[in-house]
Amino acid sequence: MTAEVKVEEKQVESEVVIAPAVVPEETTVKAVVEETKVEEDESKPEGVEKSASFKEESDFFADLKESEKKALSDLKSKLEEAIVDNTLLKTKKKESSPMKEKKEEVVKPEAEVEKKKEEAAEEKVEEEKKSEAVVTEEAPKAETVEAVVTEEIIPKEEVTTVVEKVEEETKEEEKKTEDVVTEEVKAETIEVEDEDESVDKDIELWGVPLLPSKGAESTDVILLKFLRARDFKVNEAFEMLKKTLKWRKQNKIDSILGEEFGEDLATAAYMNGVDRESHPVCYNVHSEELYQTIGSEKNREKFLRWRFQLMEKGIQKLNLKPGGVTSLLQIHDLKNAPGVSRTEIWVGIKKVIETLQDNYPEFVSRNIFINVPFWFYAMRAVLSPFLTQRTKSKFVVARPAKVRETLLKYIPADELPVQYGGFKTVDDTEFSNETVSEVVVKPGSSETIEIPAPETEGTLVWDIAVLGWEVNYKEEFVPTEEGAYTVIVQKVKKMGANEGPIRNSFKNSQAGKIVLTVDNVSGKKKKVLYRYRTKTESSS
């Protein structure tokens, strides 16, 4: 008899989300709390829960809120106008008007005063007094002009360091007149468009036409990514889009897929399989070698271009249409990551994060960090200022003891690589679309899984894994013929907590069945994942 599998799918009640750290001191406290939480969770029964579906917003126009519809329409109007008028990529340069005119504006009141003094000397005493009165009235105007201009200078100094502020304030009085003239010139700058940046009306981004009047349904999908990245602020989303287009042109991103970077970085990140919602999965393996590459200014640019290439390859796997899969799932394995004490590494990491965040908006459905060391919580505090709140809301963290369980919430076993506790192997010739079944074993009890072998000549192949093993496991072939001997395929073995999946096979010479026995000797319920295939002479 084949074991019936009855699995209750539970919705995840909560997930560990990286929240922004306000001050470094809180990091340690939060880390301890997280650690305690993990230990408490490990005392609960083990099981594979499907992820609480990360509800990505709909890209269908009808599903948007009224304010979102308006924002999308406004952005499309701005984009249409910019493309048609050929102003989308034009850079506005500032040019100052002649300084002479500005100087005249500042000194004009004094010239008038001198002129009136000369006229007053030739007039009567009574008229001279009146002229002096006029001078008294006119003179303050120069002070007024200076006061207004000086006030314009102050906000520009807020971005300087404390030392620079002190130095500038010391010299301010000595160069007051010069500052006034300079500031007046700046205030009257004019904007001139750079005519070199022309835009074709057939301009595309990730293969999607950007001109709204073309009517491509994918255009809304792309524009909504920029709007969501900027909280539906139209002007900010428009500027972000323009900067992305300029960045891609300057860095020749559209031709990056044809570049060769060698095999050195091949294991640092790679695409493999899909998650439960069909998002392509990208695995990022953090290691000492990778950190050295990022930390070296010489190698950093090569790494960045290689990483952009990988992102472009991932986007090619997406369906950028309303209702399609439009984002990737990112897995970050920190198992062999070194500590974080070198400044140059953080400069590199910051550069990677900022560039990807600024130029690939909303292309990541979730970031899952696995094999997280204790220092990760300090790293979170350092990186937090460079991440948007929306990005941080997609973070999930798993300590080493919870890696397999966490990943299986989001990725099915047949799509999860074997090194992470799944059944997926490179160039697997044994399995293709076979269903992965589940069965729960209660504490102190046993369950058997039966794989039928109806023909006398055939081969049976199976994969099996138990979350957090700590069970006794054995495999037997039981013939159908009465009185025939049972064949021990795998004698009883005590499986450790960190054992990986098992694949085995048996070639039978008579009809019967394979019986897999899981004896749960622990105090927690265990979930068993398995799949099998029967190869007969006719099928092979």
UniProtKB/Swiss-Prot annotation:
The UniProt record lists the keyword Coiled coil: yes
Transmembrane segments annotated in the record for this chain: none
Covalent S-S links between cysteines: none
Purpose of the protein: Carrier protein that may be involved in membrane-trafficking events associated with cell plate formation during cytokinesis. Binds to some hydrophobic molecules such as phosphoinositides and promotes their transfer between the different cellular sites.
Chain ranges of the GOLD domain: 433-534
Stretches assigned to coiled coil: 61-183
Position of the Glycyl lysine isopeptide (Lys-Gly) (interchain with G-Cter in ubiquitin) cross-link: K249
Gene: PATL4
This protein's record includes keyword Chaperone: no
Membrane topology designation: Peripheral membrane protein
A GO biological-process term: cellular response to auxin stimulus
Name used for this protein in its record: Patellin-4
One Gene Ontology CC term in the entry: cytosol
Main location: membrane
Keywords on record: Cell cycle, Cell division, Coiled coil, Cytoplasm, Isopeptide bond, Lipid-binding, Membrane, Phosphoprotein, Transport, Ubl conjugation
Protein origin, superkingdom: Eukaryota
Places the protein is found: Membrane; Cytoplasm
Entry similarity comment: Belongs to the patellin family.
Domain CRAL-TRIO residue range list: 258-428
Lineage: Eukaryota, Viridiplantae, Streptophyta, Embryophyta, Tracheophyta
